[in-house]
């Protein structure tokens, strides 16, 4: 008998979830630090995705999915932000939101628009769970409400 643990392969869904989380972190870093998309994608792919940092091992992430979200949000931000702003309550401006919440919403809305192969429920659930990883209060509810409103506008399956 061997004492070594056998590594189970990470399921594709888990790799996509890890890619979504990494994309939100990268978008946050770009928003706060002013880092460019090429630099941030290279940094994450070389030093973060599936790597050990400060004793914590990051889940293996689908690098293509990560790249698609980050570059897609940057490319389509002028289309994403008005949709998000319209889905917020009247007294809230997108600029008033926490940078992390903005990153979560932008990534989620990008997937709703661009990844028609992924069910709405999967996208909304994944990004609400990401919000729950960062916030205990009302932010996950806000993410859920905004993504749900936008999904009903842009996806026929969510209109039911």
UniProtKB/Swiss-Prot annotation:
One Gene Ontology MF term: RNA binding
Highest rank taxon of the organism: Bacteria
GO cellular component, one term: cytosol
Pfam families: NusB (PF01029)
Annotated keywords: RNA-binding, Transcription, Transcription antitermination, Transcription regulation
SUPFAM superfamilies membership: NusB-like
UniProt GO BP: DNA-templated transcription termination; transcription antitermination
Keyword Ligase: no
Keyword Nucleotide-binding: no
Function, in words: Involved in transcription antitermination. Required for transcription of ribosomal RNA (rRNA) genes. Binds specifically to the boxA antiterminator sequence of the ribosomal RNA (rrn) operons.
HAMAP family membership: NusB
Record-stated family: Belongs to the NusB family.
Protein name (Swiss-Prot/TrEMBL): Transcription antitermination protein NusB
Source organism (scientific name): Rhizobium etli (strain CIAT 652)
């Amino acid at each position: 008998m061997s004492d070594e643990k056998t590594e189970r392969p990470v399921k594709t869904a888990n790799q996509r979830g890890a890619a979504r989380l990494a994309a939100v972190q990268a978008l946050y870093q770009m928003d706060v630090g002013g880092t460019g998309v090429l630099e941030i994608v290279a940094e994450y792919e070389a030093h973060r995705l599936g790597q050990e940092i400060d004793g914590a091992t990051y889940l293996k992430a689908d690098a293509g999915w990560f790249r698609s979200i980050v570059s897609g949000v940057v490319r389509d931000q002028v289309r994403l932000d008005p949709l998000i702003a319209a889905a917020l309550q009247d007294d809230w401006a997108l600029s008033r939101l926490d940078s992390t919440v903005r990153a979560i919403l932008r990534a989620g809305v990008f997937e709703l628009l661009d990844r028609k192969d992924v069910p709405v429920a999967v996208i909304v659930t994944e990004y609400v769970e990401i919000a729950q990883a960062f916030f205990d209060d009302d932010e996950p509810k806000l993410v859920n409400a905004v993504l749900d409103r936008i999904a009903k506008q842009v996806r026929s399956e969510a209109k039911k």
